[in-house]
Amino acid sequence: MTKRSEAKYKIDRRMGQNIWGRPKSPVNRREYGPGQHGQRRKGKLSDFGVQLRAKQKLKGYYANISERQFHAIYVEATRLKGDSGENLIGLLERRLDTVVYRAKFVATMFAARQFINHGHVKVNGKRVNISSYKVKVGDLIEVKESSKQLAFVLEASQLGERDTPDYVEVDHSKMTAKFIRVPHLSDVPFAVQMEPHLIVEFYSR
């Protein structure tokens, strides 16, 4: 297992949940956190603890976004019309790395970030190497021609462990994806329950 995989699954172990729904997650075999004290029974969390855990879980799901970046997205969500929690999810789903993952061009969120950073992705015909790039409705995302036959790209498109959501229209024969609409929380195929309202409460303290 690579260091990147170890870090990824450490998030699963810390949360005690298989947050991406992957068959190889270690929490499929055990239900305690990482480290020598991971098997200790946890006491009831305070309201703050519950809110913090919800934030850590959502940050972890989106490839462990930094606190600075995550908080900036939250602030933007509060400035938009409507429910701040829903807005937060919508902004996270508009990230280019998220759309690349949803389109099944790669197997994991972590791989999506690296794939973009290495210049394998185009948006509306232009190469974009910033994983946090904000996709707009109608944007066409595509895998660069020379990257379409990479083994891990071909394997990812065949993964049966997750489906492509209806707000991303994918043509796997061309390796293209069109962002159809900004989703609501209920539209997003999370493997575990996400609670953005608790994150709003956390930052509103």
From Swiss-Prot:
Residues annotated as domain S4 RNA-binding: 94-157
Keyword annotations from UniProtKB, A to Z: Ribonucleoprotein, Ribosomal protein, RNA-binding, rRNA-binding
Protein name listed in UniProt: Small ribosomal subunit protein uS4
Listed Gene3D superfamilies: Ribosomal Protein S4 Delta 41, Chain A, domain 1, RNA-binding S4 domain
An example Gene Ontology molecular-function term: structural constituent of ribosome
Taxonomic path: Bacteria, Pseudomonadati, Pseudomonadota, Alphaproteobacteria, Hyphomicrobiales
Subunit structure: Part of the 30S ribosomal subunit. Contacts protein S5. The interaction surface between S4 and S5 is involved in control of translational fidelity.
Protein task: One of the primary rRNA binding proteins, it binds directly to 16S rRNA where it nucleates assembly of the body of the 30S subunit. With S5 and S12 plays an important role in translational accuracy.
Biological-process GO terms, alphabetical: ribosomal small subunit biogenesis; translation
